[in-house]
Structures are given as structure tokens and as C-alpha cells.
Amino acid sequence: MKTMIRVTLVCALSALLPVWAEAPLELVSPRNGETVCTLRPEHRDFLAKSREERRALLVDPVWRKRMVDEADSFPLPVTLEWKGGEGPFAVKVSLAGRTVLETNLAARTVNVWNLEIARRYDWTVCSAGACARGEFRTLDLAPRVMYVPNVGNVRDLGGRIGIGGRRVRQGLVYRSAGLNTNAVPKEPRKKGVVSLTPEGLRIATVDLGWKTDIDLRGDAECWGMEGSPAGAGVKWLHYSSSHYGGLRRKAGQDAFVKVFKAFLDERNYPIDFHCKGGADRTGTVAYILNALLGVDDEELVKDWEFTCFHYPKTKFSHKGYYDELLAVFAKLPGSNTREKVESYVKGLGFTDADLEKFRRIMLENP
């Protein structure tokens, strides 16, 4: 009798085991096939407004300060979440077969930064021999804003649609604020302080693979510098540059010649170019590069305007800044912005072959 009771109890307990066992792995977020966006709501709201509305906001000091304080120029991560299983968990995220994140952790959530826009990503979570797989997409909405700790206004030049409907390649050219502070100009003079944190340095040089740092600042701003704040493995090209109407003057033209030659050397990629805040000198170069690639006028102005999330002062506005940039090219030969900017660049001595080489580097294949 005792044996029968004992056997019955064991069988009853065995029947309950599936209830007690760890639930199977299940991906929670993003949902399979979901489209996610790494722009902040404030960024998306601004980009959705008309050009007239955006122009008005750039001269609104209350709005400008609030945007810098509340949104700034940093993106949101894509947060991966899952449930069930027993840690540690092996997590892998890939893009077209290329691994962009591979980590092991005990938690059931992880943030993924700096994903390309308009892409499909696959992700897998494995635990104790069991795996759950899913996919998600990133929204087709530029700019691709980048997370590089303690460096503001970092954006991928790529992601927009250019000539012939070809997308500008992502991961090749970045624009940013300075990678260090400006030097102290008065005696006793002091070199600028590196802005990149250890994490930011890893992201810039390992994750993003920066090879060249094109510094558009003046000699006084870069006093004492002998190389890139991103380290000895990053080539530092210091080309003191002009902005806006300065493109009409010889000094501004000579500087742009040096800058564009750097973009024609495939060994330099990936490239980050910047001035102090990534606004005026950087915005001027970005405008020319994007225009040569055939990015349309609305996207050209949005790329320039986006600096408003990093720089709160209303002097950075269209009147006297962007309008002056447009005036540089307005009377040049050409029926559209791309052709007018081509005329400017070819007037500096570059050839059709140079422009085609730049486009071959920067535009995705048809």
C-alpha cells in the first residue's frame, strides 16, 4: 500500500513538472516584422513640418532652447526584449548576413545603437540550446542620427535618395561637432580637451571604423594639435575652411579643393568631418556633397536645419546663413541645384570623371 501511494505521488509530481519548467523563449519587442525608428519624437515632428513652419521655428528662441534641453541631437536605441528561457542569453543582430551585435548577458533586454535606416535586421536569442528568431525594419527617414557619447550633432551623411533613385551609402561619411574642444587662445595657451569618452572612442574607431578625421577648424582653434582626438589610427586632415558666402573667396575655394580631394581617395573611408559645432563649416561641406549626389532640395535644407537640435542660438537660421549658401550657387549654370553645384566644383578644377568617382563611391548600386 505504501509503495502504491509513493508511486502515485511521484507520478502526480511528474505531471506538474511542465507547469514549473521555464517557459520557452519568446521575442517580445520589436514584434516580428515591425518597423522601428531611432529618431526622437521631437525630431520626427520637426521633419514632418512644412519648410515655412521649420523656418519659423529656427528663429523661435523658446523652442530652440527647449529642443536642445529636451531632445538634443542624440538618437534613441532599438530596445530588444524577450521572455522565457534561462540565462545567460546569447543575442545576435545581423544585417544582410553581417553581424552588427553579438553579446551574452543575463538580462532579458538589450539596447542596440546606430542601426542604419531603411534596412531589415535579423535577430536571434539563444539559451540552453533553444533559440528564438525574428526580424524588424528601420524606418526610411533621414537623417541617421548617431550615438557617440559626449560628441554632439553626429549624423551619417548617407541614407537619403540621390541620382537615379539610388540611396546614398550609409557608414561611409559622418558629420559631427568637434572631437575635442577648441584650444584656449589667450596666454597661457592650452590645447583642446578630448571630447570622446572611452565608449565613444570605441564606437567611432571600432563600430563605425573611422579612418579619417577632416577637421575644418582654424589654426587657432586647433593650436597644439598633432593628430586626431580619435587616436593614432585615424588620419587627421586639418583644412581650415570657410562657410556660406566664404565659398566665393579664394581662401574658401582653396580649402574646399583640399577637402574634396580627400573624398576622392577611397583609402580615407570611413570619414568624419567636422568643425567646432558641426553647424556652419560642416553644414556647408555637407550641402555640397549631398547636392553632388543628387539629394533633393527639401532634404538638403532638412540636413542643414537639423543642427538646431544641437545649437540653441537663433543666429543659426536661414536668413544670412542658409540663404547666403544658396546665393553662392544661384547664378551659376544649371537647371537645378545639383547642376549648379557641379558648376561650382568644376570651376575649381575638378572634372566629370572626379564627380563620377565620388558618386561611384557614395551611391548604392542600382
PLM segments and residue spans:
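Positively charged n-region of N-terminal signal peptides that target proteins for export
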Residues: 1-6
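Ser/Thr-glycine-rich phosphate-binding loops at phosphate-binding pockets of nucleotides
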Residues: 277, 281-282
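Cys-dependent protein tyrosine phosphatase-like superfamily
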Residues: 21-272, 284-366
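Bacterial N-terminal signal peptides
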Residues: 7-16
